[in-house]
Amino acid sequence: MNPVIALVGRPNVGKSTLFNRLTRTRDALVADFPGLTRDRKYGNGVLGDKTYTVIDTGGISGNEEGLDAAMAEQSLLAIDEADIVLFMVDGRTGLNVADEAIANHLRVNQKKTWLVVNKTDGLEEHSAMAEFWRLGLGDPRPIAAAHGRNVTSLIDEVLAPFPPREANAAPPDLSNGIRIGVIGRPNVGKSTLVNRLLGEDRVVVYDEAGTTRDAIEIPFERRGKPYVLVDTAGVRRRKNVSEAAEKFSIIKTLEAIKACNVAIMVLDARSGLVEQDLHLLDYVLSSGRALVLAVNKWDGLEQEAKDKMRAAIKRRLGFADYAEMHFISALHGTAVGDLYPSITRAFDSANSHWSTNRLTTILQDAVSEHQPPLIHGRRIKLRMAHQGGSNPPIIVVHGNQTGSLPEAYKRYLTNTFRKVLKVRGTPLRFEFRSGKNPYDSNPDASDREKAKQRELGRTREARKNRR
């Protein structure tokens, strides 16, 4: 099993910078003010023949109230999970009361702890470390996480007691299993839903919009099946986005939508649908992600309010009618378990593969049932269909004059293929291509000449394949 390293310290000492250095990613937000990392964030790293897992935590200041207290609790939970704690302090600002409070907790916890003095670049190391000796946590280790100085040698020593990679179990692979993106505008209950799905308080839940600033990736198993949950920062209306970190978080949210296999879009039944919900759903659709809708805070609503919400969804979310919908209470767990079958169906549909013969048969049956219209006195012909990709599924239809095919007929084909193939929870995209026969532009070409040209083309293709 991978050794687990927890990065602990007061806010803005460089924990997220070191996390990014150790995992070689930019998965943790990094900016020059405290409080950016509010939840436990997990990443994997490799050094030589050793693998490890790193937990980035929110800062502990020692006088937490409200949200800060929830962040501090997440840090303490990370300490319990870890094999090793890297207690980070700031060599530039020096020792303070919060550092001493954290050190007291670590001594009581008796977890293997390394005292790491960060931001020592440009400082005389002995002077920078001198006052931290009195914390009683052993030799302080100077590093500069932003530039990588002394980081490799530190981790090499930290991992020395642990066996090499061959003797470890395979490290948890964050790409293994269905990646579920939990998305929505701020304070609709995303983090509460994540915690309910996981069965533990892994993500900070607090009644303040925007408490999840990072996209938190959490691998887990349910009934022997692997998943990765991605809890994203809520997307706010653009005019409400002011702080640099908030803007960065929205970018992370949109990146998480692209990276997930299935997006659970959380809607707030109490506040109803707003424009930001529609914009975010439109982004999911344009990204081609499979989608499950979760209408949260459904419990306790009056029947009139429920009917009003259902009507609004039917009227305004017609463009996402491919998604299965559930009315849930993340806080109480009502109907949350029903999300998993929908997630699986959406994932399976998004990654389905069908033979050219089957797709062409469906196309021909659809054309027989309802022919394309005449364009300038000539009937649009649709000859064959094959699959052009997956996640989302793409069906390529060949014929003539396909550029003139009306949108209404394209919708008819989409609905027909979706019904016959039983595609649920994912967009189904079509590409229409017209024939490229060089004789098509020559009205005087005989059928024999056209057949001869086609045979010549097949011969060339066969020779090319033999090479």
From Swiss-Prot:
SUPFAM superfamilies for the chain: P-loop containing nucleoside triphosphate hydrolases
- The KH-like domain sits at 352-436
Instruction: Respond yes or no to whether keyword GTP-binding is given for this record.
Output: yes
**Residues the record lists as binding GTP 1:** 9-16, 56-60, 118-121
What GO molecular function annotation could you give as one example from this UniProt entry?
GTP binding
UniProt keyword GTP-binding present: yes
A GO BP term here is:
ribosome biogenesis
Region span, Disordered: 431-467
Record field: compositional bias (Basic and acidic residues) = 445-467
Q: Which SMART domains match?
A: AAA
Which keywords accompany this UniProt record? GTP-binding, Nucleotide-binding, Repeat, Ribosome biogenesis
A Pfam match: KH_dom-like
Domain EngA-type G span(s) in chain numbering: 3-166, 178-351
Matching entries from InterPro entries are given as: AAA+_ATPase (IPR003593), G_ENGA (IPR031166), GTP-bd (IPR006073), GTPase_Der (IPR016484), KH_dom-like (IPR032859), KH_dom-like_a/b (IPR015946), P-loop_NTPase (IPR027417), Small_GTP-bd (IPR005225)
Q: Which residues bind GTP 2?
A: 184-191, 231-235, 296-299
Family according to the record: Belongs to the TRAFAC class TrmE-Era-EngA-EngB-Septin-like GTPase superfamily. EngA (Der) GTPase family.
Entries under NCBIfam families matching the protein: GTPase_EngA, small_GTP
Q: What does this protein do?
A: GTPase that plays an essential role in the late steps of ribosome biogenesis.
Q: How does it assemble?
A: Associates with the 50S ribosomal subunit.
Q: What is this protein called?
A: GTPase Der
Instruction: Cite the source lineage.
Output: Bacteria, Pseudomonadati, Pseudomonadota, Gammaproteobacteria, Oceanospirillales
